[in-house]
Amino acid sequence: LTDTVALSDAVQWAVDNVDLEETLILVTADHSHTMTISGYPRRGNPILGTVETEPGKPLLDATGAPYTTLSYANGPGYKKQRPNLSTIDTKAPDYQQLGTVPMPAETHAGEDVAAFAAGQNAGAVRGVMEQNRLYDVMYDVLIND
């Protein structure tokens, strides 16, 4: 999650240091990953914690065990038998989120990725778009400058 914080800081720096009437800031990715947020954590639930309906009250899965907010479809966090998370500090720096399929590393996924824009021509970035359309949005800014 430190990369997410660094990206947020970089985007904020750009917003604070450019003229948005003359500049397009476009943030996107070329792929997604298999990390997901699982089933109904309350607003404000610790992102690295177990899912809770209210503070101190974990939501339990079909086997009666708590589960983490974040998990991976694959990766090094696979465990042959899922550990009892009620006795594990999932927010500890050395805790590794669970993965469903054993892999040496987590892989890319295939869903659409978000694109966020601010500034000149940002209104052209909306809804579901083909990735190559983002080039046209950037090109329009360049030729209409």
Predicted regions and their residues:
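A post-motif C-terminal structural segment
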Residues: 1-145
